[in-house]
Amino acid sequence: MFFYEPLSATAIMSVLLYLVFLIGMNELSRLNKWVGAVIFIALPLVLTIFVWPHTAVEGTGAGTWFQWVKTYSCLAGAILGWLIVYFPLFQKKYIVCIPPIIFAINILEACIRDFQLTGVNGIVDGYMVVGGPWNVMNGIAGILNAICICGFFGIIVSRGKKKDYVWPDQLWFWIIGYDLWNFAYTYNSVSDRSMYCGLVLLAACTIPAFFIKRGAYAQHRVRTLAVNMIVTMTIPWFFLHPAFVVHSTNNPAAHMTISVIALAFNACVFIYQAYTIFGKKRNPFKQELYIDNPGFRKVYLESIDVPEDQREAALANLEEFGYAAAWDEKGRVKTMVERP
């Protein structure tokens, strides 16, 4: 195999089961606010006191300060999204845009890590690293992806029994660009865990974003990340157990291939976004960039929490007035359905 050594039957089964588990936990967390509170607040609190001090220890790969910080930062992101979805007090302009900012910061932090590994060849934090120009290329891909984050002031809370954090301007091409970059990053930095914490983890949020609840990729991503970190801290041996581990080939050609693909795709996304901003004269700080895209319109109309006969009017006002049609003068969520 090009990217990985041949998988054993038990490894194939564990990969598939872990994917189903992550998607299932994400869907479970969407049922209502109490289930979300148990998964992202109560359970981690119990594990922090009684379990993780004994499992996330030195020599397990989960005992570093970085893993502890990463775990609680992922949980904080999931909790913030949960608060925004279920509590109107948090549905404010400058709170709703915090998750996208965190998204960008996390991308840029990973890019720095990619750059740092450029000249490294050997074991780093327990993983084989094969550094090279591909690290630089993928770091640039990540920077382009972060620059292309848009529509963060247009995030809405969906209607219906299941409440979701919906980001209509986060369309499929940005998602694929992010997935390619992130997989290349994990493959470059933690190669023998990249199947689980890269490919499987990304599939666990991309599949729901395309086939279960469109427009909620950011929510799916942060929740599956949080669940993954809970698993990592609780049973850190799982990902590197001989029966389940998926070894990278550590082939420089494989590193180069995925990094080139990530860079090329994100460069195309960047060019298309620049065309949209300058060619269509759209200001990303005042309006949605892709509001004329069929994907945007579908997500917005199926999610906006207004009566059915007012949804087209709300979309038309958002298109004409930009974010002025999405927030009131105090920065609270507002959907303009009547023209001023």
Model-derived features with residue positions:
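Juxtamembrane transmembrane-helix termini
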Residues: F87, I112, Q116-G119, G154-K161, ...
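Generic multipass alpha-helical transmembrane bundles of integral membrane proteins
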Residues: K92-A216
